[in-house]
Design a protein with these regions (language model features):
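Iron-sulfur cluster-binding electron-transfer modules in prokaryotic oxidoreductases
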Residues: 1-246
Length: 246
């Protein structure tokens, strides 16, 4: 897979800025990014954050850049609808890596790891974009035993970080992140045998790491990103191949 990054031209996508009411700053960021995209030669955008994925895929194409292109405050001149026909394929990284797994590019046997895990569906990947299978396929590809929480897929329970929640103090008890971790350890079929709470969103990672501490779950469960499982599984597969070769 050939890829590039925007380096200094990569700024914040603007999702949370927009959610807390800074619409014009959001448009400024959107205009900057689409001009940067137009200067590059590529076929797909791969996002590591479901919020960026949703913003690039669904919200940038809705922006009327022509309305703001001549505004002296706005630092862009782009005056067309961006990606209105979906000519640029926007992917979450789990979708891109799922393609590699299905094509055999990562050479995973599906037996590398033996953890019992549960998976949390991020709002912007799941409910907003109906992507439920790619993360689960990657977890299974590592060999992990995936146990579902009662609230999963379209009924998933938010981590509490969206809409500016990441920067707010929650007065209620338990916090959303604490309640979700309790659900993982008490309401899944595996119960306390759940070893890892798997996420696919950096905001969820932050919220659940905090909830793990404030909810006193530090000795009970580990928060990991799917990417960490894949890296560990690839490492085990490579070591196994070296042992066979020796």
């Amino acid at each position: 897979m050939s890829f590039g990054i925007l380096f200094e031209d990569e700024k914040y996508d603007g999702n949370d800025i927009r959610r807390v009411g800074e619409e014009f700053l959001y448009i400024e960021l959107a205009g900057h990014h689409v001009e940067s995209f137009e200067a590059c030669d590529f076929e797909k955008i791969v996002c590591t954050d479901p919020h960026s994925y949703n913003t690039f895929k669904n919200e940038y194409p809705e922006v009327d850049f022509e309305e703001f292109a001549d505004d002296p405050i706005m630092p862009f001149e782009y005056d067309e609808k961006w990606n209105k026909d979906g000519e640029v394929d926007v992917l979450h990284w789990t979708q891109a890596v799922e393609e590699l797994v299905n094509d055999g590019k990562l050479e995973l046997s599906g037996t590398e790891l033996e953890y019992t895990v549960t998976y949390h569906d991020p709002c912007h990947l799941g409910r907003y974009n109906d992507e439920y299978e790619a993360p689960r396929e990657l977890i299974r590809a590592t060999g992990c035993d995936l146990e579902e929480m009662p609230r999963n897929r379209s009924n998933s329970f938010c981590c509490g970080g969206g809409g500016g929640g990441l920067w707010m103090d929650f007065d209620e008890e338990p916090k959303p992140s604490e309640e979700r971790l309790r659900e993982a350890l008490e309401d899944t079929d595996a119960g306390p045998n759940i070893e890892k709470f798997v996420v696919a969103c950096p905001m969820c990672m932050t919220m659940y790491e905090d909830g793990r501490k404030t909810g006193d779950f530090e000795d009970d469960i580990e928060i990991v990103d799917i990417a960490e499982l894949i890296v560990e599984a690839i490492g085990k597969e490579e070591r196994a191949n070296l042992e066979v070769a020796a």
